Structure formats: C-alpha cells, structure tokens
Amino acid sequence: ADPAEDPGTGLWTLISGTGNIIDPTSPTTAIEGLSIGENVFQWTLDYSTCGVQQDIVSIVVYDSSSLPANAGADQELCSPTETTLLDAQGVNTPAIGTWTLISGSGQIADANNPNTEVTNLTIGENIFVWTVYNGECLAVEDRTDTVSVFVFNELQPAADAGLDQELCTPNQSTSLEGNNALFPAIG
C-alpha cells in the first residue's frame, strides 16, 4: 500500500427510526427491521489525519395497508352559505393527503388536513380532488378521489303554479304553467 494514502474507515450509524445494520463497516450492507416512517442513517468516513466525511440517507417505509383515497360524500349547500368542511378519509403516516381545487371556486384553509374548511365557494359546482401520496404502495387509480360541493342560489323566485283553471267535461286535459327556476336550482 502507498504510505501517502490514508485508507480510512467507514461506519454506518442509525440517526433516527429503526433498523438493524448487518455490517456497519461495509459501505454496501443490508438493513433489516425498518419501521414504517422515516429511518435515517449516517455513513461516516474517517480518514484520521485527513479528517472525517459524513453523509446521511433517508429510507421511508410506507404502510401498504393504507386505504385508497376517499374524498368523502358530495355536498349540496344553499347560498348565502359559502363555507363548508371537506371530509376525506385520513391517511396513515408517512403518507400525505393533499386537497386541490380543480373547478369552480373555493379557498382551502389547510391543504393537507382531510377535514379542512373551504371558504369563498360560489354558486354552482365546485370540485375538489383529494390526492394521497403513499410511495408506490397505492395503485395509480387509487391515489385520487373527487368531491363536488354544489351551491344552490338562494335568490330564487317564489314558486308560481299559474292561474287556477276550471274545465267542463268532456274536456279533461289542460297544461300546467309553472315558472322556471334560476340556475343552478332544479324545478
């Protein structure tokens, strides 16, 4: 060996989480017993007189038993209400769920809270998507779900069924003439 080279020594250490390092001095060792969540390890190269070099690696283990994204039931509101709570199914740590507005309007208070408040909804359909990131543990089609919050216009005209009618037999048919509802009411 060249006396000018300092071969140094390497050592793996567990910083956080769990894990059994099979050969702590091997740069390419196996690790067993990792816990769900983040597990952080440090690789230290000690070159004695030439100093110490360190780097960390994070290994995140996701829970494969996590359920697919579920944004909750569609909602119907009547103006002037412009606020509601979204009701997605929560996720198991370290998975992350995120709300996004995809059409309509609404301001999401906390995008990562499954039961967040949404304000500034407008009349009509407002669609939100709940996206779950759980590493590669969920199939692509199970990572998102949408919910519709439909706000009806309270300022609708009163129902008007039209004029009363009187008929004489044999005429036993006529037409009903009610007024129209304004969008987005049903009538």
What is each model feature region?
Residues 1-5, 81-92, 171-183:
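A short beta-strand segment in extracellular, disulfide-stabilized domains
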Residues 5-14, 92-101, 182-187:
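Solvent-exposed loop segments of extracellular immunoglobulin-like
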Residues 9-26, 100-113:
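Low-complexity "stalk/linker" and mucin-like segments enriched in Ser/Thr/Pro/Ala/Gly
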Residues 26-40, 113-127:
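Solvent-exposed segments in extracellular or luminal domains encompassing
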Residues 45-51, 133-140:
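Short, solvent-exposed loop/turn segments at the edges of extracellular beta-sandwich modules
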Residues 53-62, 141-152:
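C-terminal edge beta-strand
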Residues 65-73, 155-163:
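Proline-enriched interdomain boundary motifs that mark the N-terminal boundary
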